[in-house]
Swiss-Prot record:
Coiled-coil residue windows: none
Gene name per UniProt: rsbRC
Quaternary assembly: Probably present in the stressosome with RsbRA, RsbRB, RsbRD and RsbS.
Keywords noted in UniProt: Phosphoprotein
Name of the featured protein: RsbT co-antagonist protein RsbRC
Organism in which the protein naturally occurs: Bacillus subtilis (strain 168)
Knockout mutant characteristics: Cells lacking this gene have no visible phenotype in response to salt, ethanol or energy stress. However cells with multiple disruptions (RsbRA, RsbRB, RsbRC and RsbRD) have an increased basal level of sigma-B, indicating this protein is a negative regulator of sigma-B.
Length: 282
């Protein structure tokens, strides 16, 4: 990387001007973009982040890559944690990186012009190349950090959806309820199995009501998954009761030759709970 302490000092002296010029020339109308915000706090943070970046990128002209690169990575990591940046489409952010880079190129050109007696054309080309390379590195780092952050958010959302698709609700003490609603295919049945076992163990549930009143259709594969769930629950010390089996499912079960032998059944969830409470009182 080309070194030039005088250029570093020149850019550092103009860092605030570069930042101000950049912000004042933003043209943004998309309300989803951080660059269109009118919130004073958001604006202040955005300006501070940009100015901090300017001071850090300037160091490419005095430091080796193994020194300045971790500093730029740390800046990129912090900015990609910012909710306002996370809400902003990535192509807007890249556009602003390019605008800042173009401003820097103009300042480097001005520096070369002011110091044409000492900065030769070959050295000037090296300085331009160093600047472009540094910005390319930062953009790459930023996109990578944004991808990591977005992936973590998507995984968290996926985990939440999975949990909500088969929520184990603690009714009282160690008694829980698993209300199943909607269509259940083999993929969802597998998620229900994994999530239910995990939640029962986590919430210390020893008795679980599995209510099927919201399920209209069930096939052989899903039924076997359901039976496997009940058996797996038994192995971890959880007794299960099926309730709310609709007539359509009962008819399908008979036609498919499915057996509910050995499984505790109740017509409704209310009757299942009432029956168990009555037995406990006796």
């Amino acid at each position: 990387m080309a070194k030039n302490k005088k250029l570093f000092e020149y850019l550092s002296q103009h860092a605030e001007t570069i930042s101000s010029t950049w912000y004042e020339t933003i043209e943004e109308t998309d309300p989803n973009s951080i660059y269109a915000s009118t919130d004073p706090v958001v604006i202040h943070n955005l300006k501070s982040q940009n100015l901090a970046f300017n001071y850090k990128i300037n160091r490419i002209f005095i430091d080796d890559e193994d020194v300045y690169l971790p500093i730029l990575k740390e800046w990129a990591f912090e900015v990609t944690q910012d909710q306002e940046h996370l809400k902003t489409p990535i192509h807007y952010i890249i556009r602003e990186f390019v605008r800042v880079r173009d401003l820097y190129v103009s300042y480097v050109k001005e520096f070369v012009h002011l110091n044409q007696n000492t900065v030769k054309s070959e050295e000037a080309e090296d300085l331009y190349h160093a600047l472009i390379k540094a910005f390319d590195l930062v953009i790459h780092i930023f996109i990578e950090e944004m991808y990591k952050n977005t992936s973590l958010q998507l995984q968290a959302q996926k985990d939440m959806i999975t949990e909500l698709s088969a929520p184990v609700i603690v009714l009282f003490h160690s008694v829980g309820l698993l209300p199943l609603i909607g269509d259940i295919d083999t993929v969802r049945a597998k998620l229900i199995m994994e999530n239910t076992l995990h939640q029962c163990a986590k919430k210390k549930v020893t008795q679980l009501y599995i209510d099927l009143s919201g399920v209209a259709v069930i096939d052989t594969m899903v039924a076997h998954q359901l039976f496997s769930l009940i058996e797996a629950l038994r192995l971890i010390g959880v007794s299960s009761t099926l309730s709310g089996i609709r007539p359509e499912i009962a008819q399908t079960a008979v036609q498919l030759g499915l057996s509910f032998e050995g499984i505790s059944l109740r017509s409704t969830l209310a009757s299942a709970i009432a029956s168990d409470l009555k037995l406990k009182k006796v």
